[in-house]
């Protein structure tokens, strides 16, 4: 079980057109993974670095 509720949210790239490197916690694989964020929208399961993702969702 992830440490925080935001970590169970599905990856959501948002609704704009940029491709900004970001990371999210993949609950099925129990690890943080890279994805492209569009620059707007999405949800809180989005981190600037893999370290921040791991610190928040894994511990």
Curated annotation (Swiss-Prot):
InterPro entries: Kunitz_BPTI, Kunitz_BPTI_sf, Prtase_inh_Kunz-CS, TFPI/VKTCI-like. One of its GO terms (cellular component) is extracellular space. PROSITE patterns: BPTI_KUNITZ_1 (PS00280), BPTI_KUNITZ_2 (PS50279). The record marks 5 as: May be the major determinant of the binding affinity for potassium channels. Keywords: Disulfide bond, Ion channel impairing toxin, Neurotoxin, Potassium channel impairing toxin, Pyrrolidone carboxylic acid, Secreted, Toxin, Voltage-gated potassium channel impairing toxin. The record marks 9 as: Important for binding to potassium channels. It is found in: Secreted. SUPFAM superfamilies: BPTI-like. Expressed by the venom gland. SMART domains: KU. Disulfide bonds join 7-57, 16-40, 32-53. It holds the Pfam family Kunitz_BPTI. The record marks 19 as: Not important for inhibition of potassium channels. Gene3D superfamilies: Pancreatic trypsin inhibitor Kunitz domain. The modification Pyrrolidone carboxylic acid is found at residue 1. One of its GO terms (molecular function) is toxin activity. It comes from the Eukaryota. Residues 7-57 form the BPTI/Kunitz inhibitor domain. Serine protease inhibitor homolog that blocks voltage-gated potassium channels (Kv1.1/KCNA1, Kv1.2/KCNA2, and Kv1.6/KCNA6) (IC(50)=0.4-150 nM) and facilitates neurotransmitter release. Negative results: does not inhibit serine proteases and voltage-gated potassium channels Kvl.3/KCNA3, Kv1.4/KCNA4, Kv1.5/KCNA5, Kv3.1/KCNC1, Kv3.4/KCNC4, and Kv4.1/KCND1. Belongs to the venom Kunitz-type family. This is Kunitz-type serine protease inhibitor homolog alpha-dendrotoxin. It comes from Dendroaspis angusticeps.
């Amino acid at each position: 079980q992830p440490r925080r509720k935001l970590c169970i949210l599905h990856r959501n790239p948002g609704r704009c057109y940029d491709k900004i490197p970001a990371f999210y916690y993949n609950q099925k694989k129990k690890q943080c993974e890279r994805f492209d964020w569009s620059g707007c929208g999405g949800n809180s399961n989005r981190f600037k670095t893999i370290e921040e993702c791991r610190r928040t969702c894994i511990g």
